[in-house]
Each structure stands twice: as C-alpha cells, then as structure tokens.
Amino acid sequence: MGASQTVLPFKLGATDESLTAHCGLALFGEYLRAIDVGGLIDHELPGPGSAAGYDPSAYVLPLVFMLAGGGRTLEDLRVLRNDTGLRSLLQLDDMPSSDATGDWLRRMGATASDGLKALQRVNRGVFRRLLRRDERTGYTLDIDATQIVAEKREAHYTYKGEKGYMPMVGHIAELGLVAGHEFREGNTAPAARNLEFMQACERKMPKEKRIAAVRADSAAYQAGIFNWCEETGKVFAIGADQDAAVKAVIAAIPESDWKTFRDGEIAETVHCMNKTNRAFRLIVMRRPRDQDLFEEQSPWRYHAVASNRDNEDATATMQWYSKRGDASENRIKELKIGFGMDTMPCGTFPANAVFFSIGALTYNLYLGFRSGALGSGWERSQVQTVRWRLFQTAGKVVRHGRQVFLKISAAMLDIFTAIRERCARIMREGGVVPETS
C-alpha cells in the first residue's frame, strides 16, 4: 500500500466551523440550568478568595458534564475545555484547567474550607427536590460498602487485601437515588458506623417523606440497628452473621420444616441477640455443597436473613431481600463504572472524598434528567446507553448576531425539541432546588 493510500475511500480536511461531537450534553446542561444547580453550588460552597477567582460552580459543573459524558480523569476535562462548540451551548465561557481543578479539589477537602460539608448540602438539596416529585411517602433504604482500588501512597489496605477506599452508599430502592454517601478509608470495616449512616440518610429526607424499610448485608447485623428499626416503625431484612448462636439455631430447625425454594431449600425460625429488645424472624436458605469424599463438613451451604416483616412466608421475605441486588449492588456498579467512581484522581483522601461527592451528585442529577426530561422509553436506560443514543450526537454551532443555533441531523431534531420543552416546563413549574436547611 502506497504512502498516500488509505483503507477507506475518504479524505481528511480541517474546518474553522464550530463543531461538537457531544451536543446532547447541552440538553443535560439545560436541565441543570432549569433546576438552578449552579446557583445552589455557588450558594453553598466557599467562594473564590479574590475577584479574579472562579466561582465554585465553574469547577463543579465541568466535572459533572465530564463524568456524565464518560470522562474518568481530570485530564479528560481537556476534551470539554477544547470543545468550544459545546462550551458555547453550555455557556461555559471561562473554564479552569485540569490542574486548577485538582488544586481546587484539594482545597475543598481541607478541613478548614468546610467544602465537603457544603457539597453534602448540595447533594441533600438535589436529593430532596427529586424525592418531592414522587407521590410516595415511605421508601426502602438499601446500604452497602464498596471497594475502590487505588494505588495511592496514602491509601490503606481493605479487608480484601487491596489498597484503596471503602465508601458507604445508601440508595432509595424505589427511585435509585443516592440518599447518602460516606467516603471512607480502605481499612474501615464495612460494619463500622452503619447505624449512624442510616440515621444520616433519614435526616436528609423531606419532612413529608420517611424511610419505612431497611435492607443491608451481614455487616449491618447489629442489635442497635434492629432496635432503631423497631423504635421508629421500620421493617428490615438484613443478612445474618453466622456466628455460633445463629449456627446453633439453624441446626435446631427440624428437617420437616425445610421447603423447596429456587435451587435449594428454605425454612425459618425465631432468634434474638443479647442486646435486641425483641426477637426477630430468621429466614434460612440452604443449598447443596459440593463435597469431597473425605470431608466431614455439612453437606449444605447456608444463607440467613434477619427480618421483622410480618404476615408473609419465608419465601416472600427472601424474595424481597434479594431485590437489593438490583436496588443497591447494581446501582453502585452504575455509580462506579458508569460515572467513573471506580478510580480516584488525587493522591489525598480528602480531595478524593470531594470528587466522590461530585460523582454522587452527577449520578442523582442524571436520574432526575432521565425521569424528568427524557420522557417515556428511557426510564431504565443506563448512562452508557444515553451517551450512545443522545449525548454523543454531532452538531454544528452557528452564531447569527446574538443568537446561537445548533444544527443537528433531522433524525434527532424531534427528540431534542421534546427534551428542551420538558426542561422549560420543569423551570416554569418551579425547578429551583429548595433550601438545604
């Protein structure tokens, strides 16, 4: 093949026209403007130290757009910074560099700045606004700790033997929203401060809403959590820690009580801990274990769930508990893989805590955009699908006087128009995020 030959028969050429390969992100930006997220950020976060500095939203919003668009590192901000067409649509006239953004993350993470607490207030304001759009009053809280591997000098080893972090995340099962998050050191036990975390999530609920149910894995198998649920009228289903007492109770279940369930058998009994105020149901599932001829261990593998859900059989409770696989574990995967929270950009824990909080904010804003602006057919779309079908739409930005025109393919025109109309309606109906106090 000669030097001038190519595989496909097209030629390259440069243009001075204002083009963007991500003009669908302008729709996401229009939604953020409709609910005035930028105003909330500037109201809550510490401002610049001088008149020449950037407002907080000038740092946060580019990170939100970058994460929603598929970027994963601070260097990916350069793609947005160099996309003059998209920036003109988003009205990002002046944008900090990736190095300046990294410095800002470190400043916000410093204890004296109070930046992390301010971001929590922003997250709470957005969360409450989105929750108020839903007609329900009682919700299920799913919590789980998740490992983020990070070969940072200051990172600690997790219980899985890898250096990194172990944040705790709480989701509202019915809507998928992140109700709360706590960025934690890698050597923090998953069982640490579970009750305090649940209570913090509850405090973020609007006054007319409440957490009515709690689900968690065996890290939350704690008497304090069970007692709190009973005292506040919550139902719970929590994986049981198979300590000696639980094993003894399981061993005492009569063989006649076991019923076929899925690929194993299920039964239930009653149990209590030393410090629980009331006894609770213990639903036990067992599956056959592959055994060696000379092994003496039990032929069964057991999985137990503690619950106070009444008026239903063991299978119904186990099925309800199993739903946390989608409601919590899969949504954490979306937060980490879909929104880039599986890698941390900075070398210090506080700066990464700020970055993770912005990731959680982006996740919730995306859910609000999907449910409020995208319309029917998108309800369960993961962000990677929306990127491929919407965000990564090519367009040409044209200026005529003071007017800006976005030229897109005819096939996308009706979709863009409908989304923009929904964003305008959201703003007319009072889209501004409420006070965070």
Functional labels for PLM-detected ranges:
Residues 1-10, 14-17, 235-337, 422-437:
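An anionic, glycine-rich sequence signature occurring as long contiguous blocks
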Residues 1-164, 169-188, 194-207, 393-437:
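Dynamic "connector" segments at or just before major functional cores
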Residues 31, 77, 317-358, 362-369:
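Short amphipathic alpha-helical "interface-anchor" segments enriched in bulky aromatics
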Residues 214-222, 242-244:
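Acidic, metal-coordinating catalytic cores used for nucleic-acid/nucleotide bond scission
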Residues 341-415:
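Basic, amphipathic alpha-helical segments enriched in Lys/Arg and hydrophobic/aromatic residues
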